[in-house]
Every structure is written in C-alpha cells, then in structure tokens.
Design a protein with these regions (language model features):
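A short helix->beta-strand "capping" segment at the edge of beta-propeller domains
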Residues: 72-74
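Conserved small/polar residues in nucleotide/adenosyl-binding loops
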Residues: 246-247
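A detector of repeated loop/turn-to-beta-strand junctions in beta-rich toroidal repeat architectures
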Residues: 2, 15-17, 38, 58-59, ...
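Glycine-centered tight turns/hairpins at beta-strand boundaries that repeat
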Residues: 1-15, 25, 31-33, 44-58, ...
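Short glycine-/Asp-/Thr-/Trp-enriched loop segments that recur within the blades
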Residues: 35-41, 80-87, 128-134, 171-177, ...
C-alpha cells in the first residue's frame, strides 16, 4: 500500500547500505538496520515482516525483519542457493520468490528462481531469459517480471507458481526500473534506463498500456504497492529522495 512501506539497503554499502526506514504515509522514520549493509539486493514482504536477500557484498545472505521488538530488527534467514546481485523478489517473508540477477564478480547473468518458505530457499523453474535489474510484482504463486539488462529489454514473463511464461512485451524497453502489483494480472512498471522521461505502464494480465508518467525521471529506484496505490522511492536522478504516489 502507498501508506505503508519499508526501505532497506542500497548504495553506497557503507555506511548507508544497512539503513532501514519505515513509511507511514506522510513521513519516513528510521528503524533497525540490516545486519549486513548491501546494494543491488532483492526484497519481499511487508513493513511488519520483510525479507532481504542477495546483493553485494553478501550475495547469498538473507535477513528477516520483524516489528515484534521496540524499533524492529533484522535476523538471519536461510542463504540463497545461487549467489547473486541485481535480483528481484515477490511474495512474503514466509512465502517469497527470488529471480534473476548476476553472479559476482564476473557479472554472469542467471535465470535462477528460488522459493522461500520462511526457513530455506528451494530452486524452482528458471526464467526464460536471464537478466538483472529487472522489474517485479506479485506473490510466490502469481508473479510478473519485466524489463532488465544489461542491455535494456522489454521482455515480460508471467509466473504461475510453477513455470515462467513469456507474454506481451513492455512498450518501452528498459532496465533498472521499478514495479508494483498484487499479482500477475495487475501491475505497474515505471522509470528506468535508458532515460525514458519517467514513463509508467499498466499491465492488465495481457497487455501493457501507457499511463501517467512519474513526476521526475530516475533509475535504480524501488517500487512497492499495487497497481492502483503504488509508491516509488530512492534511486538515481532528479529528486532521488522524493517519494511519488500513484493512484
């Protein structure tokens, strides 16, 4: 929801890459830091129960965030099977999904997908196209991924809980973009590289349609929420600390 979000990690990895902040609608507030600061990580879950995984310099590490303590705290979870950065995630802390990315330090692209049960990661069926810095939306059983790199792509794939299926492409090819959406039938894709003027596209389960653009261009940002109530924050470019609401 656009009135509740959690931001964690990012570049530079020291000292700011461990910072965690909680969004309540009008304001951000600092809460408990990640145990390991990192950038290019994946995430899933909610403001009360989040999941952080992969990234650099700890490409297999998983941490779980819970608000059962005074300010919220991260604890160690099960490691990813495939070390990677630039991956994306979907789902919850106890039913998560990690996909795509690149293996450091050589930046070998991977299509690997892993499912998390709250304790361990299990390898499941791969993406059709290996890529990193891709867009993401959905749950462990109903996810969508789109765009990515290293060369900007418009490719979109739909996850049904078992397999990834290639579906209709984005209208604008891009990488290092953000996404939001409840499942694989409704999602938003916004901003990214190459400079696109902040284009936003809406997914209806079959096709992408251009809708209102973001107020400022940026890339490597984070997106959360649903197709009708999304939040974009962070990233590189103009006003990179500003949160933007889409309704």
């Amino acid at each position: 929801l656009s009135t509740a979000a959690l931001a964690f990690g990012g570049a530079p990895t020291s000292p700011s890459g461990a910072l965690t902040e909680s969004w309540n609608g009008p304001n951000w507030a600092e809460t408990g830091d990640l145990s390991t600061g990192r950038a290019l990580l994946g995430g899933a879950g909610t403001t009360a129960a989040a999941l952080a995984f992969g990234g650099e310099p700890s490409p297999t590490a998983t941490e779980e965030f819970n608000t059962g303590v005074v300010v919220g705290a991260w604890s160690t979870g099960g490691d990813l099977n495939t070390a990677r950065r630039g991956l994306r995630g979907a789902g919850t802390q106890t039913a998560g999904l990690a996909f795509g990315g690149a293996i450091p330090p050589g930046n070998t692209l991977v299509a690997n997908t892993e499912a998390y049960n709250g304790t361990n990661w299990t390898e499941v069926n791969d993406l059709n196209t290996a890529r990193q810095n891709l867009g993401n939306a959905g749950t462990q059983t109903s996810a969508l991924t789109f765009g990515g790199g290293p060369s900007a792509t418009a490719a979109t794939e739909l996850w049904n809980g078992t397999n990834w299926t290639e579906v209709n492409n984005l209208n604008v090819a891009r990488r290092r973009l953000a996404g939001a959406g409840a499942d694989n039938t409704s999602a938003l894709a916004f901003n990214g590289l190459p400079p696109s003027g902040g284009e936003t596209e809406s997914w209806n389960g079959t096709n992408w349609t251009a809708v209102n653009a973001m107020n400022s261009y940026r890339y490597a940002l984070t997106g959360v929420g649903t197709q009708t109530a999304a939040l974009g924050f962070g990233g590189h470019g103009a006003s990179n600390k500003t949160c933007l609401l889409y309704t």
